[in-house]
Amino acid sequence: AANLGLCLATLSLLFLVTSCRKQAAASSDDSPARPAGDVIAEADTLYASRGDLTRVRQGLIALRHSQATEAGSYDLAWRLAKFNYYLGSHSPDDTERDKAFSDGIEAGKLAVKLQDGKPEGHFWLGANYGGSAKVSMLSGLSEITEIKREMETVLKLDEGYSAGSAYM
C-alpha cells in the first residue's frame, strides 16, 4: 500500500509538472506580435548606437522577428538590408561579415520587389552588393553591374537620398 501511495504521488507530481510546462509553452506561443511600427522605432533607436555592434545585432533580431509575421513590409525589408550592411562593414569576424552582406542582399532584393519606386531598397541593395564586392574579388567582378544599376536607380528616384552618396 505504501508503494502504491508513492507511485500515485509520483504520477501526480509528474502530471502537474507536465501540464505546467505545456501551459507555459502555450502562453508564450500565443503572445501577440508587436506592431511593425514599434519594432521599427526600437530598431532605429538601436541603430543610433550602432558603434556598439551588439546594438546592430539586437536590431537585426527584432527586425527579423517582426518580418516573420509581416513578410510584406517594405520598411522592415530595407532596414534589414541597412543593418546587415553596417554589420558586414564593421564586423571583425569574416563569417559574420559575409553572412551579413548575403542577408543584406536578400533583404534589399525583397525591398525592391515590394516597392520598386522607392530609393531605400535600391540604395541598401547596392550598398550590400558593394560591401560583398569589396571583400571578394570574384564576387566584386560579377556584382559591378548590379551595384551600378541600383545606384543609378536611387539617383533617378531621389538624387539627394543619403546625402547623394549614391554618386560613387
Kindly label every feature range from the protein language model.
Residues 1-8:
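Bacterial N-terminal signal peptides that target proteins for export
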Residues 24-29, 34-65, 80-160, 164-168:
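Short coil/linker segments at helix-helix boundaries
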Residues 10, 66, 71:
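Short, flexible active-site loop motifs that bind/organize anionic cofactors or intermediates
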Residues 16-19:
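C-terminal motif of bacterial Sec signal peptides marking the signal peptidase cleavage site
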Residues 69, 73-75, 83:
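Glycine- and aromatic-enriched membrane insertion/assembly motifs of diderm outer-membrane
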